[in-house]
Amino acid sequence: MANVAVLLAPGFEEAEAIITIDILRRLQIEVETLACAESRAVVSYHNIPMVADSTLTERINRLYD
C-alpha cells in the first residue's frame, strides 16, 4: 500500500490540507500528517488548531512514496 506524508506548517490552509488528506484516504493511500514544528499541535491560517500524527523531526528517517 502506498503511504504519503502531509506536512502541516504553522499557518497552513486547513481546507487544502483536509481535502487532500480525504482524497488520498478515499483512494486507500495511507496518510500520516506531520507537523513542521516542535509540537504535534499546529494552528492554521484561520486559527483552527489541528493535531498531527507526528512531528517531522520524529519521522525524519522514514521513507514515504
Please place each PLM-identified region on the residue numbering.
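Extended, subdomain-level signal for the structured scaffold at the beginning of enzyme domains
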Residues: 1-65
